[in-house]
C-alpha cells in the first residue's frame, strides 16, 4: 500500500506476532530472526493459560482496563523502520492519536538528533490544544551529551529515563558512541533530571542488580520489542518472575513487548505492571488510520 506518507514496512499480518517480518532490521522485525519478538507475544498467552489452569481466568478478565494504564511506546526511525517518506511526518500523528485516546505518551531518542527534537516538537505542538507531558527515553550516550539532551526535553517531560539495553542496538551500531551505563552514571543522570527517573530495558539479572542499587522511580521491563541482542526470553515471563522483587526497589513497574489485546493488558496488570506499553499496533494504526479500532482491542472502561 503506497500513500502520500510512504510505504509501510509492516506486512499487516492478521496477527502481529513476529513471524511475518523475519530479519527486517531496519524495519519492524527483531534480532535472532525475531525470536524474542515472538516470545513476547506468546508470553502473555502462556501466563494467562497458566492462570486459567489455576482457576484464575475470571479474576484476570474482571480487571478493568482504562486509558490511563496504557502508553504508546517510544518510537523513532520513521523512515528506515516504519516506511514514512519523511521522518517529520510521524511524530505528531502518533503522539496525537495516543493523547486523544487518553493514553500516556512515550518519546524516544535516536540518531541523528533530529529524531528526539521532532518528538519534543510534537509534544510542544500538542500543548497548544491540551495539557500533556511525555515520558522521554534517551539512548545511553556519554554523560555530557545526556545532560544536554535533558535540557531539551525537561519542559515537556513527566518522566525521564535511559534505554540501558540499547548500548549495542543494531540500528544505531557504528553510528554513534553509546555506553553500557554503570550504577554511578545512572545516579548522576538521575540527579540532573530533577524528574521521576525510569530505568528502561530491565530484562536480565545484571539489570536487576542495577535496579537494586539505583532504586529508580520506575522500572520499565523491556527487551526493546525483541530488537536488542540480549538473552532469549519474554518480558511477560520476566514480569511474572521478578515483579514482587522489583516492587521493593521502585514505585512503579512498566512493561512492553507483545501487547496486542485487552486480555494481554489485563494479564500484565494482574502480574504486577502499573503501566502497559504498546508500539507496533499503534504504529500501524497511525499509518493506516484505524486507531479507534486498535484502541478498542486494547481496553475498555
Language-model regions: role of each:
Residues 2-209, 213, 225-228:
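Active-site entrance/lid segments in N-terminal catalytic domains of soluble metabolic enzymes
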Residues 89, 177-180, 233-240, 291-294:
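Charged helix-capping and loop-helix junction motifs
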Residues 199, 229, 255-256, 278:
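Thr-Gly-centered strand-to-loop micro-motif
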Residues 144-154, 203-216, 241-255, 259-276:
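Catalytic cores of alpha/beta
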Residues 165-166, 214-233, 267-293:
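Glycine-rich phosphate-binding active-site loops on the catalytic face of alpha/beta enzymes
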Residues 293-301:
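Extended, intrinsically disordered, low-complexity segments
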